[in-house]
């Protein structure tokens, strides 16, 4: 059965459920997912970097690849930059180059984890000189954001300690607040600071921004334009991420997402590949917040993945599509029935209401949306048939690989 016939069957079913199909399609067309520049370049683990033929080696090449994802999905028009990985001499020119590809430059991510000086921390380092270096880098990123037209500084710190007694918890907290206050004061309106947390790695005893409560505390101390960024891979196993999302929405402090998936830790697997039901439940809370007039939501939806074994552009297309699927399913939830079941204390019916939406095959719906947008209905198939991969392999070649360990 072709997608058109499958869509007719699905549309009839959804109409019978009382779904406003035009509204759902409109929401899907308006969905936006930002992709990361670093997701198009070679990456790996501390054990090995497996290089890929044709992988992007310059910022311009990363943007070229991101434009392919936008070309075949239609909802990924912005690209996050990582500084200094994406540092260039002329950001006005980079912005114009991106615009020429149909893209905009998105969140600016300071790198506060690779310099040798940051062994004991960056913004929390006990040495004031090194803290100054880290703060100055963040201030540089604010200037870069101004030049690129970005209104987001996305901040993740690797800062923490590995052993008891290594440093003062309260001393590091105070140093971090002092640094963040200087950064926040330098950010012009409406630029936002998104504070990302992670419960461990690379620090193993404690992490200075280890959980959502800590990130929220700092955001509340700074001001309304400081918010929390939720990375799906940055939680202990079993964490109820959708509850965290709901609480942050209710406090008007959910600033952004880094979509990815995990089996054990910060695995950076393709979003939706391991636990698609969790992703659906997260989108359920996001839609619930969007429908609440008492909540002011301005959420940056971003992917944060390093594709070590999958082809990078295909993996990114797959990731965007998986976000579309989760969002589409969540849009189909009968919210009136859900609320009635909750009020009646009917736990089974409440859960079944969610499952009815989750179990719906929304691929024909997404095919119809893409057709309306003038896109191919099968993004990965269309990309594979385009010849782009073969073209960049011939033009770019393959970089040399490396190991995470010396002399290996």
Residue ranges and their predicted role:
Residues 24-30, 60-75, 87-110, 142-149, ...:
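Acidic (Asp/Glu)-rich catalytic clusters
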Residues 13, 17-27, 104-105, 117-223, ...:
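Active-site acidic/histidine proton-transfer and metal-coordination neighborhood
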Residues 50-54, 77-93, 163-164:
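Glycine-rich, proline-tolerant flexible connector loops at the mouths of alpha/beta enzymes
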Residues 38-40, 82-86, 110-115, 158-160, ...:
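Active-site beta-loop-alpha junctions enriched in small/polar residues
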Residues 1-39, 49-50, 165, 178-184, ...:
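Histidine-acidic metal/acid-base catalytic patches
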Residues 35, 66, 98, 134, ...:
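Conserved, mostly hydrophobic/aromatic
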Residues 31-50, 111-125, 157-163:
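N-terminal small/glycine-rich loop or linker at the start of catalytic domains
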